Amino acid sequence: ITGIGIIAPNGKNKRQFWDNCIKGLSFIEEEPEMRSIGLKSSVLCRIKNFNLKDHVKENEYLGLIELDNFVQYGVVAGEQAIKDACLDPLNLNYAKKTGIIFSSAIGGTPTIVKIFDELTSNGKTDIQHKKIGERFYNSGMFNYPAMLLAEKYGFCGPCSSVSTGCTAGLDALGIAYK
């Protein structure tokens, strides 16, 4: 493991994340809506005050602003990891051996649910066949952030996405270590 990037409720980079963990700060908040949809829990942690333009250049990833937040978070965390690893984007000698292990607990599920609700009148009708936009597929694919980064930097090593719920980040570290 040579580089780590993090976008999380308790930090938008490795240092901020770790400092907030050490301080024991909680970013849990009540969300009554969770109970109304049948969940036993009513708490969650949100990533707040994230602005993609603060992290990537405007033309660096075309269309990224239109994709699900998880894709944006993944690309920004990936860029952080590449910087953390001190990889020189102009030196492609390492590209054949460099891989990406990416993780997300739920990926683009919010976008998938939103589109499903739109196509079924919130689950009350059969799916209506109509255009949903060209960005839908990429917003829902767990591997899309890793693919964007591998393509941009020419990485040819393993490119994998892990989606194992709350342990996805730890699982990605374990897989990368192996």
Indicate residue ranges for each PLM-predicted region.
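Short, hydrophobic/aromatic alpha-helical segments in well-folded domains
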Residues: 172-176
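Conserved "HGTGT" condensation-loop signature of ketosynthase/thiolase-family condensing enzymes
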Residues: 1-158, 178
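Short conserved active-site loop signatures built around small residues
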Residues: 169
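Short catalytic-loop micro-motif centered on adjacent basic/acidic residues
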Residues: 159-163
